[in-house]
Amino acid sequence: MLVLTSAVLALTPVTANAAEAAPSQVTETVIAAPSPTPKKPQKKGWVKTKSGIRRYYRKGKRLTGFQKIGKNYFYFSAKGTLLKNTTVNKGYRGFTYYIDNKSHVIGRKKGSTYYTANGKRMTQVQIANLRSKQIAAEITNSSMSKSQKLQTCFNWVIKGYYNIWRDFDQGGKDWPATFANDHFLHHNGDCVSDAGAFAYLAKAIGYKNVYVCADAVQSNNNAHAWCEINGYVYDPLFAEAKSYSKYYGATYGSYGLYPVLKYKIS
C-alpha cells in the first residue's frame, strides 16, 4: 500500500499554478551607448606651428590685422601669420604700418602724417628714429660688421645731391631730426640734412655717442654741420665734394672745424 501511494504521487501532473511559480530563465542583452568624441581643447594665446609660424588665438579664433596684445601692437596677415620686419601698405583702416624685427608695430602713417602704434601723432624725433630704422634695415644686412654698416649708411647719404629745403634757423629745437627728415623724405639736402640723416642712421645700427655739430649758432644760416661719433668727425657733404678719406672718421685736428652747437642723438 505504501508503494502504490508513492507511484501515484510521482505521476501526478504539475498544475498551472505551480508552473507560474517557477523562476524565469530569460537573459537580457544590454548594448552600451557609444562614448562621445572628446572635444579638442580650444586654442588660446601664442601658438607656434612646426614650420615656425607664430599666431595668436583669442576665444578659439586666430587674430588677423592690427592687434594690441598686452602692452605691444602687432600685425597679422589675413591667414593669421605674425608679420616681422616689414611694411604693410594700405592696411587696417588705410594706414601704412611699420613693423620691426621683433614683430612690434613701431609706427603707422596715413597721408603724410606719422603716428605712434597707439595712435598719437609723432614728433620730428620719433619720425627720424622710425625712418632711420627702416632705411638701415633696407640697405644693410646681418652679415655686415658694425663698421661696414656705418660706411654703407654714409655712402647712402652722400648719393643724394645737394639741395636746401629750409634755412638753419627754421629747424626748431630738434633741428637735427627736422633736417634729417628732409633728407629721408627726398634723399637729398644740405650739410645739416646730410649730417642729421647720417647721425640717425648711425644710431639705428647701434652707435651710442652720436652728435650733430655745427660751427655757428642756429641763427646763423651760413653755419656748417657734420656728425660726430665717438669723438671722430663724419662729414657727408665734404666727403662728397672734397675728399672721402679726409672727412670719413677724421680727427678734429685734421678736420679744422670745431663745434659751437652740439646736439646728442637719443
Regions found by a protein language model. Name each.
Residues G196-P259, S266:
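Hydrophobic/aromatic-rich core segments of domains that either
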Residues Q126-H183:
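Secondary-structure boundary elements
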Residues L2, V8-I127, D169, C213-N230:
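Extracellular adhesion/carbohydrate-binding repeat motifs centered on closely spaced tryptophans
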